[in-house]
A protein has these predicted regions:
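Active-site neighborhood of glycoside hydrolase catalytic domains
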Residues: 122-201
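The substrate-binding groove and active-site-proximal loops of carbohydrate-active enzymes
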Residues: 19-31, 55-73, 109-128, 152-163, ...
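Aromatic-lined ligand-binding clefts that engage carbohydrates, nucleic acids, or primary amines
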Residues: 398-414, 443, 513-536, 543-544, ...
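An active-site-proximal structural segment forming one wall of the substrate-binding cleft
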Residues: 72-89, 112-148
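Catalytic-core region of carbohydrate-active enzymes that cleave or remodel glycosidic bonds
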Residues: 176-177, 209, 213-317, 325
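Aromatic-lined substrate-binding rim segments of carbohydrate-active enzymes
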Residues: 34-100, 171-176
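Aromatic- and acidic-residue-enriched segments that line the glycan-binding/catalytic groove
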Residues: 63-69, 93-117, 167, 171, ...
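N-terminal carbohydrate-binding accessory modules
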Residues: 1-48, 78
Length: 595
């Protein structure tokens, strides 16, 4: 049995061991491509894969657990082990990761608890999740013949809190459930975060996260170790080789040669985990959101990250630059030729059916009635859209409407006619409507949850609760008697295309095409407005013509030999009679500074 130890260095069976790791999140890459990505990691000369674990995927509703198909973490670990790769697993409840709500399930927002704290209610919820998760991970520990070297207790907690009782509680939950491998924390490498977010006083291993200036950052970590009498190896648990992207902002890139030199600096002093090695995709509604002041800044669907592998998993110029550096400076780590996947293109896929959301609403959702508007989470919904509907009489020729405390984006319609779209800070501003006095009208408000904040000071903000939190005013009073239509859009097969379509309304558009040999491709959405797309029922994620991304990645495994269908839900009234599949992503140039 192989033994892994952390002393003055990392040791495998008593021999000094340098961890050469790359991050591949199993939940961002289809299972059919796990081997491809893991093989390319091994081909680089690396020996370990690292992955987070996304709680909100494994327990989407309280007490409902999923570990099958794309969530089969055990299969991912076994695939890595079959290739001779070790694993670092980060099952901490919070993962950040530019992932919806930092990986926490949204149903926690309906509970009376303080998240990421020693609050007993929160610890109890984590414990129930760990009962399911850790029973599946423990057999894969190195001690039990698997490939897991070590596991994380919490993620960058020093950038959030200093509740050491919480960190100790998570550690205890893990150890009580059979975790025997070394445990660690990862934080920014400066004193304040290390002091707040680690358990160095309890002899829990400490790692740092950074993306450059390795000598300086490691020196800060070494200083912290020395203060506490620790003779530990240095490891960068997240070496940021690229960066994520947000709507309306430029694509962030990094020079391959500069990156290779920066990686060399890390390896001259310690061990590394490249974050990301393969970024993959935020399929569905799982993109995260940054916070800047009072603003939320949702991230795009692509998690390409300008990583060593591109979104579909093929080596990039960065991969080749790091591979060359490794061969030159660290020739003791054998390399292989990497694998490449083919892509495909397809022009002029015709529109075959279309239907307005308001027409097919009842086939997609059952209304929930209440006196005042309810939040998304109160309705048992976590992601997607929520339609609020009521009826009202107009008391003046020009009425004033206001949405009070709404998030994130609201589109208001009167009798099916678009009136106003408001986004974040605009919500709450007056909306003026010219109506026929005394006439009874239907008021519809379509609200989109564009992704919850995954990091920072707004993690506990009330804006994490989506939909309309207070109410809707006409003149100075709140309107009553609302119907709520939850639209998580997890049932596109129920769209009734036999119903009508009205120009300018949110609508579904269906496009049929045939494929002889499925290959990776991208759906060009540059002439559409905003929405989400599906292929054969799989949610590809969001699109928005503000950029910087104007396409959605379609993995080959989402396509079928023969007949295929793409359905586009578009909310702005912008669509095309034909769509196109391309070999490469479609991007929008936005002026700005790169990383």
């Amino acid at each position: 049995m192989t033994r892994f130890e952390i002393r003055d260095d990392f040791y495998l069976d008593g021999k000094s061991f340098k961890i050469l790791s790359g991050a591949i999140h199993y939940f961002r890459v289809p299972p059919e491509d796990w081997y491809h990505s893991l093989y390319n990691l091994k081909a680089l000369g690396f020996n370990t894969v690292e992955t987070y674990v996304a709680w909100n995927l494994h327990e989407p509703r309280e007490g409902e657990f999923h570990f099958e198909g794309a969530l089969d973490l055990e299969r991912f670990l076994q695939t890595a082990q079959d290739l001779g790769l070790y694993a670092i697993v980060r099952p901490s409840p919070f993962i950040c990761a530019e992932w919806e709500f930092g990986g926490l399930p949204a149903w926690l927002l309906t509970k009376d608890m303080r998240l990421r704290s020693s609050d007993p209610a929160y610890i109890e919820a984590v414990g129930r999740y760990y009962d399911q998760l850790l029973s599946r991970l423990v057999p894969h520990l190195l001690d039990n013949g698997g490939n897991i070297l070590m596991m994380q207790v919490e993620n960058e907690y020093g950038s959030y809190g200093e509740d050491k009782a919480y960190l100790r509680a998570i550690r205890q939950l893990m150890e009580e459930r059979g975790v025997t491998c070394p445990l660690f924390t990862s934080d920014g490498p400066w004193r304040a975060t290390l002091k707040a977010g680690t358990l160095i006083e309890d002899d829990l291993f400490v790692t740092g996260n950074f993306g450059s200036k390795a000598p300086y950052n490691f020196s800060q970590m070494q200083e912290f170790f020395d203060e506490h009498g620790k003779k530990w190896p240095l490891m960068c648990m997240e070496f940021w080789d690229g960066w994520f992207n947000r709507w309306k902002e430029p694509i962030i890139t990094r020079d391959p040669k500069e990156l290779a030199d920066a990686v060399r600096e890390v390896l001259e002093q310690g061990s590394i985990n490249l974050y990301m090695f393969h970024g993959g995709t935020n399929f569905g509604f799982m993109n995260g959101c940054s916070a800047r002041g009072t603003l939320d800044l949702p991230q795009v669907t692509s998690y390409d990250y300008d990583a060593l592998l591109d979104e579909e998993g093929n080596p990039t110029a960065k991969y080749l630059a790091v591979k060359k550096m490794m061969a030159t400076h660290f020739p003791e780590y054998p390399q292989l030729e990497p694998l490449y996947k083919e892509s495909m293109e397809l022009d002029a896929i015709p529109l075959v059916e279309k239907v307005s959301l308001f027409e097919t609403l009842d086939s997609l959702s059952s209304p929930v009635e209440s006196l005042y508007p309810k939040k998304m989470e109160e309705l048992g919904q976590s992601y997607g859209y929520l339609l609020y509907r009521t009826e009202t009489n107009w008391d003046a020729e020009e009425e004033r409407l206001r949405i009070i405390d709404g998030r994130d984006r609201a589109q208001l319609y009167v009798d099916g006619q678009w009136v106003k779209t408001q986004y974040q800070t605009e919500i709450g501003e007056d909306i003026f409507y010219q109506g026929e006095k005394k006439a009874l009208s239907r008021l519809d408000i379509l609200v989109e949850n564009m992704g919850r904040v995954n990091y920072g000071h707004k993690f506990l903000a009330d804006t994490q609760r989506k939909g309309i939190r207070t109410g809707v005013c006409k003149d100075l009073h709140f309107l009553l008697n609302w119907k709520h239509y939850p639209l998580p859009l997890d049932n596109p097969e129920k769209i009734d295309f036999s119903k009508g379509w009205t120009e300018g309304q949110p609508a579904f558009y269906a496009y049929d095409f045939t494929v002889q040999e499925p290959k990776d491709t991208y759906l060009d959405l540059s002439e559409f407005g905003k929405g989400v797309a599906f292929v054969n029922g799989q949610n590809l994620g969001r699109f928005w013509n503000v950029g910087p991304t104007l396409s959605l990645y379609i993995p080959h495994s989402y396509l079928k030999e023969g007949a295929n269908r793409i359905i586009i839900f578009e909310t702005e009234g912008q669509y095309k009679e034909e769509i196109h599949l391309t070999r490469k992503p479609t991007l929008k140039h936005i002026k700005g500074e790169n990383l």
